[in-house]
Design a protein with these regions (language model features):
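Amphipathic alpha-helical dimerization/coiled-coil segments
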Residues: 2-5, 90-117
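Short beta-strand/turn micro-motifs at beta-sheet edges
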Residues: 9-13, 73-74
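N-terminal helix-turn-helix DNA-binding core of bacterial DNA-binding proteins
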Residues: 11-55
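Basic amphipathic alpha-helical segments that dock to polyanions
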Residues: 56-63
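Beta-hairpin "wing" of winged helix-turn-helix
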Residues: 64-80, 86
């Protein structure tokens, strides 16, 4: 359990499509390889979101196949070959749509939680 006693959320606990949106958002920060994406998700979420390789890499391949990510082989910080992902124009459009839908959903859930007391 991470500091603060917060239980990590595994990919299986996320709403469908959430991992794709989070990956697209992380990649807006600049070209990054898969391991870097998982680490950045963990760091930014303060150890709440933990994405295993078995979930991350199929998602990256799916996003690349849809044309939302572009990938290029390069050298990682430890000198190994790694596939670096960056957001495509189509991916930017999709991310805007996903963020809008997420904000609408989060607002609806917040409204229910506030009134159901």
């Amino acid at each position: 359990m991470p500091p603060g006693g917060v239980t990590p959320i595994e990919k299986s606990d996320l709403l469908p499509g959430t991992l794709d949106m989070l990956i697209l958002k992380i990649v807006t920060l600049g070209p990054i390889h898969g391991y870097g994406i998982s680490q950045r998700l963990r760091q930014i979420s303060k150890d709440v979101l933990l994405v295993q390789q078995g979930s991350l890499y199929p998602a990256l391949h799916r996003l690349e196949k849809r044309g939302w990510l572009a990938a290029e082989w390069g050298e990682s910080e430890n000198g190994r070959q790694a596939k670096f992902y960056k957001l495509s124009a189509k991916g930017k459009q999709q991310l805007r749509k996903e963020e809008s839908n997420w904000n609408r959903l989060a607002g609806a859930v917040a409204n229910i939680l506030q009134t159901a007391e």
